[in-house]
From Swiss-Prot:
Role this protein plays: Catalyzes the ATP-dependent phosphorylation of N-acetyl-L-glutamate.
Source organism (scientific name): Lawsonia intracellularis (strain PHE/MN1-00)
Protein name: Acetylglutamate kinase
Catalytic activity line of the entry: N-acetyl-L-glutamate + ATP = N-acetyl-L-glutamyl 5-phosphate + ADP
UniProtKB keywords: Amino-acid biosynthesis, Arginine biosynthesis, ATP-binding, Cytoplasm, Kinase, Nucleotide-binding, Transferase
One MF annotation (Gene Ontology) recorded for this entry: ATP binding
Length: 296
């Protein structure tokens, strides 16, 4: 390493110092999904970032998705999968595959990668200790001058309650929870949107940060420029102006709910960027779009 590179790295370490102190002992919830879960280099850098947070005294909690992996397994098993309004209709056969993939292969791969990076990760689904209590979530479509249409999505659920004691026990012992977004009502098993689970966990724990990894830079304005920061109170305009649409709508709704439940800051950031988590947390500029409450 030449002297200039060494000097640059030393400056980066010094820049991170106040943030390391600020986040010491704090809970940070990360939603892990998209391209960051597919690319080999990004998977490795994600695991290293999570391990680093843990090793410097921060408490990361990871909630992961797995839609493409579920789709691949359903195809291999010749199980047809139906989508309504972007949501997977989850019958009994599909739910068995969803649970097998999310709580099994995907979850354990992430656990193994974080462990290899030098930390201690533990894989969970919401059925462990019934810590994610859920209920059935049917889709209600409303059309002008017509009665609402209720669409049965099968075992698609929504979060009712997060039992935090299991998570606190793990992080206090230095473990990193890696969570598959599967919930239960103690009778049925439910497939839940991973963004919703991450937001609910962050809110229940009053996390310092909720970070959502996506396949875009963050929220873009109508000129396709990154919105670096927005107040919670100004988010309705993002919907009314058509700035957020499609899959970004439920993502932003989860962000809003998390802040309303006590999360200090939510950031939507680009998971395609290597070590984007560290760049967001430990640099002056940060990356992505941050959402915070207006100061009183």
């Amino acid at each position: 390493m030449d002297m200039e590179k060494a000097r640059l790295r030393s400056h980066m370490l010094i820049e991170s110092l106040p943030y390391l102190q600020k986040f010491q002992g704090k809970v940070i919830v990360i939603k892990y999904g998209g391209h960051a879960m597919k690319d080999t280099l990004l998977k490795q850098s994600f695991a290293q970032s999570i391990a680093l947070l843990n090793l410097v005294g921060i408490h990361p909690i990871v909630v992961h998705g797995g839609g493409p992996q579920i789709g691949n397994m359903l195809s291999r098993l010749n199980i047809q999968s139906e989508f309504r309004e972007g949501l997977r209709v989850t019958d009994k056969a599909t739910m068995d595959v969803v649970e097998m993939v999310l709580a099994g292969s995907v979850n354990k791969e992430i656990v193994n990668q974080v462990n290899q990076a030098g930390a201690k990760a533990v894989g969970l689904s919401g059925k462990d200790g019934a810590f994610i209590l859920a209920e059935k979530n049917d889709l209600i479509l409303t059309k002008e001058n017509q009665p609402p249409e209720i669409i049965n999505l099968g075992n698609v659920g929504r979060v009712v309650h997060i039992e935090t004691s299991l998570l606190y026990t793990l992080i206090e012992k230095g473990f990193i929870p890696i969570i598959a977004p599967v919930g239960t009502d103690n009778k049925q098993t439910y497939n839940i949107n991973a963004d919703e689970v991450a937001g609910a966990i962050a809110g229940a724990l009053k996390a310092t940060r909720l970070l959502l990894l996506t396949d875009v830079e963050g929220i873009l304005d109508l000129n396709k420029k990154l919105i670096q920061s927005i107040y919670l109170e100004d988010t309705p305009k993002l919907f009314s102006d058509g700035i957020v649409f499609g899959g970004m709508i439920p993502k932003l709704q989860c962000c809003i709910e998390a802040i309303e439940q006590g999360v200090e800051k939510v950031v939507i950031l680009d998971g395609r960027l290597e070590h984007s988590i560290l760049l967001e947390l430990f640099t002056d500029q940060g990356v992505g779009t941050e959402i915070v409450k207006k100061p009183v």
